[in-house]
Amino acid sequence: MKQDIHPKYKEVTVNCANCGNSFVTRSTRPTIKVDICNNCHPFYTGKQTLVDTAGRVERFNKRFAKSTAAQASAQ
């Protein structure tokens, strides 16, 4: 077997971009940044909030409207 082929597995800090929470875990990456953690996730907090990343819903609706308009004009 080859020696020293595996990456170093060390303690890293995970930072939440939403609430600022941080905790320590182990990984091969130097730092980990997450959008939502267990302190601010709607499932764990019991609060219903809309989590929309970069307007994906609006982008989908805009594309869907274009495709339905194209189909209507083709008929």
UniProtKB/Swiss-Prot annotation:
Identify one Gene Ontology CC term for this UniProt entry: ribosome
Question: What task does this protein carry out?
Answer: Binds the 23S rRNA.
Record protein name field: Large ribosomal subunit protein bL31
Q: What is a biological process (GO) this protein takes part in?
A: translation
What organism does the UniProt record list as the source?
Answer: Pelodictyon phaeoclathratiforme (strain DSM 5477 / BU-1)
Subunit relationships: Part of the 50S ribosomal subunit.
Q: Name one GO molecular function term.
A: rRNA binding
Annotated keywords: Ribonucleoprotein, Ribosomal protein, RNA-binding, rRNA-binding
Keyword Ribonucleoprotein on entry: yes
> Is rRNA-binding set as a keyword in this record?
yes
Matches recorded under Gene3D superfamilies:
Ribosomal protein L31
| Protein family per UniProt | Belongs to the bacterial ribosomal protein bL31 family. Type A subfamily.
